[in-house]
């Protein structure tokens, strides 16, 4: 759901030019998205179990690999977004990424089909198991690299390409709504049907279904290529930011001026408000817009070196990015705690009683579907119930930062409940009666509620505060933060494993509950840091045509 803003009009009909772009592209885009979503979630949700059962990798090491993969899945979309914006356009990037993903999932299917591509399975009751060879790991990592790169290349690009097919903001918003619903539908299908197939039929069939979904989505997308509007690469949005920094450094000895006419302004862009004097914050950057004899052409008075002279608007755009950086840092610990909890929950589920009756056994990798369902339900409740009631009582709307704060509180509460549940589970281990897997559901429901508050609100903050030229990048900033968080969760688990005895390979002999309490303490400190940042933060003034619907779920 990263980078998406839900339209309040869930039943809006998508209109547009049915000859090139518009409504004729809708079934191709949505079908492609559904297939890619089924594929991506189908292999990643159960990755820890696959590594443990098929590669004889220890549980904590498997969790570490899973966190690294999830980190790449969250961070690489920004790289592909820059490639699409700067060089190739969205349509070629999606085509190439879908094909790369197909190669990766096909290789995973081969691994699960041929025994010589993976170590021999552990014998029943045996403690010593064959470790994977360099060849086994090489093939595995190649498959993971391909499918990760391919999946990442379609996430942001499909959202942008789909929205670009329409001209009206209402139609774009409606497409984003369908995008969100389709991604989560694919995730739920994978977390239930695909994961169940992997654990109860075979890994080969499970990965084979993912490969089939990927192949169909690739064919569907290519089939509709002649109907798409092809966006032209517009250059990297980061170039302007870099130029401001370079220009400010080159003029570091220049004395700033208090006269408006001494600063270079960008008056030709009608979409922007004409800014006179640069703001007082981050004053050292103001030199980038300060005119000097070296910066201007003597004949026409125009700037002849954009790396020495930037406009006041460009300087203010850079400042707006710097202002939200402290808020962005606050996301990192939230994502870290979620990453640790996701990994530990799978390991906990593997040592609980997952049988709901004599025949059905809940797959460990399917538990994360609870987070998705909880998040979706509360996104709707927030939009139609909670936010309107709050507005009626207080005559004010919850700001995005207030929503982020509420989400962080739910996140802390979820970690505390996870600690309590794990302490109870360890007591049942002593009594030799495995705890029911259903005890793991309440903290997952609560973390999903937290996601419904803070994730989309963070997207709204960055979308509103970033420069107009970086709005597409702004929608992926939250995803980048969570990508880094997965790497941090890997580092945190590694640190705890090295310095304590809380995380042995058999968590029945460890203290995972203490790990959760560490996350609670860190969450409280992070919440305090966020409150301080929010107190001093002021929202950027956005033109009316860029403001969001007051009934939008991110308000």
Curated annotation (Swiss-Prot):
The chain crosses the membrane at residues 32-52, 68-88, 91-111, 127-147, 175-195, 205-225, 324-344, 369-389, 401-421, 437-457, 476-496, 517-537. InterPro entries: MFS_trans_sf (IPR036259), POT_fam (IPR000109). GO terms for molecular function: transmembrane transporter activity. Belongs to the major facilitator superfamily. Proton-dependent oligopeptide transporter (POT/PTR) (TC 2.A.17) family. It is found in: Membrane. It is a multi-pass membrane protein. This is Protein NRT1/ PTR FAMILY 2.1. Keywords: Membrane, Nitrate assimilation, Transmembrane, Transmembrane helix, Transport. GO terms for biological process: nitrate assimilation. GO terms for cellular component: membrane. It comes from Arabidopsis thaliana (Mouse-ear cress). Transporter involved in a passive nitrate efflux. Gene3D superfamilies: MFS general substrate transporter like domains. The keyword Transmembrane helix applies. Expressed in roots.
